């Protein structure tokens, strides 16, 4: 089994939905967001880019938001607090505190060893491998629901997790499967 302390995971992106519990006049909100775009004929919300934290917000008149590009849940909380403070300055009344729901977290990582993906694909259940279409094995984890892309270099991308703990659990499940089928054993060097 691979030593889990040697496996590295890094958050690349977090997407969250947010309910502000307030109706918004998007024309007024537009003035609060200097780095923003609003064209209701093309898209029904404001696309707003913040520099600190570095995230993008999709702001809808219903008071619903989508926050993307965050590297931490704290970044999302800071972005929502920053927007809420600006909205209060133009008289927006909130029925209650904003509700943040993480929808997806994307992690990149490294298992620390190389793999023969043809062997992995023929051996592991719950995976797909079409090297003409995509250079990695697509491994689906049922619980916690997520997808891991495994590349021959040992690099991985885990998406669909709702928390860092879920991502680690998904990676542990992949490693257990690889170990179960002997795919983590060191290959002997040919003489």
UniProtKB/Swiss-Prot annotation:
- Keyword DNA-binding on entry: yes
Q: What is this protein's function?
A: General factor that plays a role in the activation of archaeal genes transcribed by RNA polymerase. Binds specifically to the TATA box promoter element which lies close to the position of transcription initiation.
User: What organism is recorded for this protein?
Assistant: Pyrococcus woesei
**UniProt record similarity statement:** Belongs to the TBP family.
List the Gene3D superfamilies hit by this protein, alphabetically.
Answer: TATA-Binding Protein (3.30.310.10)
> Would you say which domain of life the source belongs to?
Archaea
Query: Could you identify this protein by its name?
Result: TATA-box-binding protein
Per UniProt, the keywords (alphabetical) are: DNA-binding, Repeat, Transcription, Transcription regulation
Query: Keyword Transcription regulation on this protein?
Result: yes
Which SUPFAM superfamilies does this one have? TATA-box binding protein-like
Q: Which GO terms describe its molecular function?
A: DNA binding; DNA-binding transcription factor activity
Query: What processes does the entry annotate via GO biological process terms?
Result: DNA-templated transcription initiation
Start-end of the sequence repeats?
11-87, 102-178
């Amino acid at each position: 089994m691979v030593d889990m302390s040697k496996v590295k995971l890094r958050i690349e992106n977090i997407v969250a939905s947010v309910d502000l519990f307030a109706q918004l006049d998007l024309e007024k909100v537009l003035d609060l967001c200097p780095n923003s775009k609003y064209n209701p004929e093309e898209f029904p919300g404001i696309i707003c880019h913040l520099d600190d934290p570095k995230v993008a917000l999709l702001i809808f008149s219903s008071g619903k938001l989508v926050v993307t590009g965050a590297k931490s849940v704290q970044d999302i909380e800071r972005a929502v607090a920053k927007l809420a403070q600006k909205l209060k300055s133009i008289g927006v009344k909130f029925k209650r505190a904003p509700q943040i729901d993480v929808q997806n977290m994307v992690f990149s990582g490294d298992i620390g060893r190389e793999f023969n993906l043809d062997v992995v694909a023929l051996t592991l259940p719950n995976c797909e491998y079409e090297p003409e279409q995509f250079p990695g094995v697509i491994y689906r984890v049922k619980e916690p629901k997520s997808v891991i892309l495994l590349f021959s270099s040992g690099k991985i991308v885990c998406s669909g997790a709702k928390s860092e703990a879920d991502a680690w659990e998904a990676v542990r499940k992949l490693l257990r499967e690889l170990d179960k089928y002997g795919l983590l054993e060191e290959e002997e060097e040919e003489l």
